[in-house]
Amino acid sequence: MPAVPVVAPRAIDLATLQAIADLPSEPRYNSQRNLGRDLMLLSFALGGINYADLYALPYDAYKVDYIEYKRQKTQHARADEALYRVYICEEVRPLLTRYLDPTRKRLFIFHRRFPAGNFPTKVSCAVKAVEKAVPFERHYTYYSARHTYATLAYNVANIDKYTVHELLNHSDKEMKITDRYIERDWQRLYDAHKRIVALINWSSICEG
């Protein structure tokens, strides 16, 4: 059996995440730091969503109480096409509303501001601006929001590891058959997600 690759730690701690949320908005419309802050927090608020999915979400993914989408990275490896729902917590609605696409061509406006091919670079530069303002003991990136979501879920919110696995919408070969028999309890996942999102105070970001 091939060895499982070791992934270097990418999570930041709760205090650093809160400091990012508390970063005051810069007055410039095209502020890299504002964008990076909001992208990190959007990812955390939406269960560690990756930027490819965030960019491509269709408007009809928005179901008022939750966002429903198929995770691009694993949709072709699973019978359910990696279908997932992430609950929209009330405290983060102002942040989501800030980026909704008024044309409704997609859920968020990123496709109108950045060509698809440039978006990864824009995300990287934006998060670097955040990192400069809020340093941590090791380098972090956009994907640190996903790692932080999982780490805080398990270590701080005391959510069991399998529920964290479900919240991340991971594909597990060992559980593939079993998962076909189990109907998802979305309310259980929503409740767990709420506990994670509630770990930080969103008032500063939602006022900004």
Predicted segments, located by residue:
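Catalytic-site neighborhood detector that most strongly recognizes the C-terminal catalytic loop/helix
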Residues: 3, 71-76, 168-198
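Conserved tyrosine-mediated DNA breakage-rejoining catalytic core shared by Y-recombinases
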Residues: 56-98
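C-terminal secondary-structure termini that scaffold catalytic or DNA-interacting sites
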Residues: 90, 104, 111-114, 174-176, ...
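C-terminal catalytic core of tyrosine-transesterase DNA break-rejoin enzymes
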Residues: 41, 45, 49-52, 122, ...
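Active-site/catalytic core of tyrosine-dependent DNA strand-transfer enzymes
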Residues: 11, 17, 89-137
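Short, contiguous acidic/charged loop-to-helix segments that flank catalytic cores in large enzymes
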Residues: 26-30, 72-87, 110-118, 136-144, ...
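Short, polar N-cap/turn motifs at the start of nucleic acid-interacting alpha helices
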Residues: 60-68, 137-138, 159-180, 202-208
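Long, amphipathic, Lys/Arg-enriched alpha-helical "connector/arm" segment
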Residues: 1-35
